[in-house]
Swiss-Prot record:
Lineage per the UniProt record: Eukaryota, Metazoa, Spiralia, Lophotrochozoa, Mollusca
Reactions it catalyzes: a ubiquinone + NADH + 5 H(+)(in) = a ubiquinol + NAD(+) + 4 H(+)(out)
EC number(s) reported in the record: 7.1.1.2
EC top class named in words: translocase
Assigned keywords, A-Z: Electron transport, Membrane, Mitochondrion, NAD, Respiratory chain, Translocase, Transmembrane, Transmembrane helix, Transport, Ubiquinone
Homology family: Belongs to the complex I subunit 6 family.
One GO cellular component term noted in the UniProt record for this chain: mitochondrial membrane
Species this chain originates from: Albinaria turrita
Role of this protein: Core subunit of the mitochondrial membrane respiratory chain NADH dehydrogenase (Complex I) that is believed to belong to the minimal assembly required for catalysis. Complex I functions in the transfer of electrons from NADH to the respiratory chain. The immediate electron acceptor for the enzyme is believed to be ubiquinone.
Name of this chain's protein: NADH-ubiquinone oxidoreductase chain 6
Amino acid sequence: MMSLSFMLGLIFPVFFMFTLANPMSLLLLLLIMSLCAVLWLGSIMSSWFAYILFIVYIGGILVLFIYVCMISSNYITGLYKYKTLLYVGMVVALMS
């Protein structure tokens, strides 16, 4: 049951990713997905391996963050409301 929760934690941000227009929000979702993957991996394998993997993810996300800050300076943060409701409804249906 715990494995199913972690897998849904990895799937939910993928559905939510299509509703975001801001690259910074996408980086935040990437961080959430990597954190869920590391927690899941830490529960089934060595916690040291999961910790090192998380540090590598954070390093990659920092490089992406710097790149996005240089390229796109003035994006407006916003959500597409109808797609968000559709994807949240799909995730709730999957979880029930």
